[in-house]
Amino acid sequence: MSDGGDAERRDRLRHDLRTPLTIVSGFAEVLATERPISDADRREYANRIHAAAIEIRELVDALLED
């Protein structure tokens, strides 16, 4: 792969990893606050964190297989 292709792949990977990490960080921060959160919102935030963690794991697995 050319240097340009490597840079594109790295940029795409950076974006693909940062997006779910931002989701995990943001929703975990909300859950860690002491402000009242409804049970429904708490479940939704936990589900989003879980989905983002699965996405990260799949990206890492794909990287390790390359």
Model-derived segments and their meaning:
Residues 43-47:
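Short, charged, amphipathic alpha-helical segments
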Residues 51-56:
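Short alpha-helical segment of the dimerization/phosphotransfer core of two-component systems
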Residues 32, 57-65:
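Short alpha-helical N-box/ATP-lid segment at the N-terminus of the HATPase_c
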Residues 1-8, 62-66:
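Conserved signal-transmission helix
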Residues 32-39:
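Short acidic helix/loop segment immediately C-terminal to the autophosphorylated histidine
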Residues 11-15:
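Conserved phosphoacceptor histidine of two-component systems
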